Swiss-Prot record:
Single GO molecular function: malate dehydrogenase (decarboxylating) (NAD+) activity
Cross-referenced SUPFAM superfamilies: Aminoacid dehydrogenase-like, N-terminal domain (SSF53223), NAD(P)-binding Rossmann-fold domains (SSF51735)
Upper lineage: Bacteria, Pseudomonadati, Pseudomonadota, Gammaproteobacteria, Alteromonadales
Gene this chain is encoded by: maeA
UniProt binding sites for NAD(+): R154, D267, N415
UniProt catalytic activity: (S)-malate + NAD(+) = pyruvate + CO2 + NADH; oxaloacetate + H(+) = pyruvate + CO2
Annotated EC: 1.1.1.38
InterPro entries, A to Z: Aminoacid_DH-like_N_sf (IPR046346), Malic_enzyme_CS (IPR015884), Malic_N_dom (IPR012301), Malic_N_dom_sf (IPR037062), Malic_NAD-bd (IPR012302), Malic_OxRdtase (IPR001891), NAD(P)-bd_dom_sf (IPR036291), NAD_malic_enz_proteobac (IPR023667)
Gene3D superfamilies (alphabetical): Malic enzyme, N-terminal domain, NAD(P)-binding Rossmann-like Domain
Name of the protein in its database record: NAD-dependent malic enzyme
């Protein structure tokens, strides 16, 4: 029997049920339930279906004209009736995705303390560093299987938001459920409150976090270590997703823990996986292979380098040597092209720096080679922006790229919309509709010469829900690079443009459940092959995916004796 058909036995009654978001049904409680649980008189007379409730909620939602107000309204529903919240979001996923997550969630993070209404998740503050086990035991969620954790230092393109960064784990886990079918009862957002270096927050009397400069060095490392150990003691099988940590911490934390715990960094690995999946789809549409591309990045931080390493891995999988693959990837930051003689290269940048001997014959060769010079000399076929610098993909740069590449692949991925390197409208007009475009934020379709182009949003929500579902269904103990590569290939297999020669580069969000299940199967298979999960047949894995896929439907309640 499916879980939603099996009755749930509850040991409490009365107003307490209406205050519990995971079990509250509001006006959908039946006559029998209203009698058994002492709810008569606490609710209006009419008994509604969840669709009737969702219709009313959507009508209320459409009365708001401001995106932040819409976000706050949806969060209020989430905090009172989670099943209704997810039914509403799933009914309007394309419309509401930008409201519950990027770009609107950025505004919500900036105003988190001012708009605070009700607790959700855990705030683990540095002054409580010796009591982390106690704090985890205080969680209202007991069967946690997926955790998203941030320290709020690098929230989207907005920088240090302190505990305001909690909006990101809340939003990410909303997508795990609405896109990946993970039961909200299994999810827990966590913020590590280690202070903030944002002077506006420190001086704001409404700021609700620990009013202290950020800790760093050994203090920070020991605090995160204590947190990871405590989580493993409390929920040893939970998947931990690191989210929006600063560059100086993101890669070291990932390297330290990826082989100890079931964890991954979405900014580094999730972004890389969805980008590679989108590139594979674009290459299929252009009837070429990723290993035949020359790829230029603007932005050489942890996210950009994570994507680049994933591209290198895929090129190697397609038959190139590592040296050949790395020679086809060009990383540009604010100082110009990364070169192997630069003394300021970070450890994760070093393998991606171009050899000076290989490029000394370029026109305008110097210590600081600009993006335009890279385009003119390297002649890239792929241009990816993760810089957060708006408008830097200029008409001159794009036309220079198009002059040697009939179908340029251009991915301006920076979030939020105000930080995008170029708009799809400009990119398609400058290339007369020939560019293959995917963006990090949502954009409206573009019309060029009477042809309408749907703009694919290269959003991690295409990837991480499926990864989470696959890990959960297979019982995986680790998230390996091979599992991430499998998720990329599975996403590319769902591309309408690659499959049919028309339509968007990525499937519509209305098909996200199908996509997530397809990715979950691919991820689970690799986990089993690598020994990160117990052996099982493909049929059993598929059944486990279906069994673990939660849907927003009310369950019947029965009262236990008390």
């Amino acid at each position: 029997m499916d879980d939603h058909k099996r009755p749930l036995y509850l040991p409490f009654a009365g107003p307490a049920i209406l205050e519990a978001p995971l079990i509250n049904k509001g006006s959908a409680f039946t006559d029998e339930e209203r009698v058994f649980f002492n709810l008569e008189g606490l609710l209006p007379h009419v008994i509604e279906t969840i669709e009737e409730q969702a219709s009313r909620a959507y009508d209320q939602y459409t009365n708001f004209t401001n995106d932040l107000d819409k976000h706050i309204y949806l969060r209020n529903i989430q905090d009172t009736n989670e099943t209704l919240y997810y039914r509403l979001v799933q009914n309007h996923i394309t419309e509401m995705m930008p409201i519950i997550y990027t770009p609107t969630v950025g505004m919500a993070c900036e105003r988190f303390s001012k708009n605070y209404r009700r607790n959700r998740g855990l705030f683990i503050s540095y002054p409580n560093k010796d009591r982390i086990d106690d704090l985890l035991n205080n969680s209202t969620r007991q069967k946690v299987k997926i955790i998203v954790v941030t320290d709020g230092e690098r929230i989207l393109g907005l920088g240090d938001q302190g505990i305001g960064g909690m909006g990101i784990p809340i939003g990410k886990l909303s997508l795990y459920t609405s896109c990946g079918g993970i039961s909200p009862a299994y999810t827990l957002p966590i913020t590590l409150d280690v202070g903030t270096d944002n002077p506006n927050l420190l001086e704001d009397p409404m700021y609700m976090g620990w009013r202290h400069q950020r800790i760093g060095g050994e203090e920070y490392t020991e605090f995160v270590e204590a947190f990871m150990q405590a989580v493993h003691r409390r929920w040893p099988d939970a998947l931990i997703q690191f989210e929006d940590f600063a560059q100086k911490n993101a890669m070291p934390l990932l390297e330290r823990y990826k082989d100890q715990y079931c964890c991954f960094n979405d900014d580094v690995q999730g972004t890389a996986a969805v980008t590679v999946g989108s590139l594979l789809a674009a290459c299929k549409a252009a009837k070429t292979k990723l290993s035949e591309q020359r790829v230029t990045f603007l932005g050489a931080g942890s996210a950009g380098c994570g994507i680049a390493e994933a591209i290198v891995a895929q090129m190697i999988a397609e038959g190139l040597s590592e040296e050949q693959a790395r020679a086809q990837v060009f990383m540009v930051d604010r100082w110009g092209l990364l070169q192997d003689n630069m003394p300021t290269l970070l450890p994760f940048q070093q393998k991606l720096a171009q050899k000076c001997d290989d490029i000394e014959g370029w026109d305008n060769f110097s210590e600081n080679i600009s993006l335009l010079d890279v385009v003119n000399n390297a002649k890239p076929t792929v241009l990816i922006g993760v810089s957060g610098a708006p408008g830097v993909f200029s008409e001159e740069i794009i036309k220079a790229m198009h002059s040697h590449c009939p179908r340029p692949i251009v991915f301006p991925l920076s979030n939020p919309t105000s930080r995008v390197e170029a708009t799809p409208k400009d990119l398609l007009h400058w290339t007369k509709g020939q560019a293959l475009v995917a963006t990090g934020s949502p954009f409206e379709p573009v019309v060029v010469e009477d042809e309408t182009f749907e703009i694919a949003q290269c959003n991690n929500s295409y990837i991480f829900p499926g990864i989470g579902l696959g890990v959960l269904a297979a019982g995986a103990k680790r998230v390996s690079n091979e599992m991430l590569m499998a998720s990329s290939r599975a996403l590319a297999e769902c591309s309408p443009l690659a499959l049919d020669g028309e339509g968007p580069l990525l499937p519509p969000l209305e098909e996200i459940h199908k996509v997530s299940k397809h990715i979950a199967l691919a991820v689970g298979k690799v986990a089993i092959e690598q020994g990160h999960a117990l052996p099982c047949t493909d049929e059993l894995l598929e059944q486990s995916i279906e069994d673990n896929f939660w849907t927003a439907e009310y369950r019947r309640y029965k009262r236990t004796s008390f």
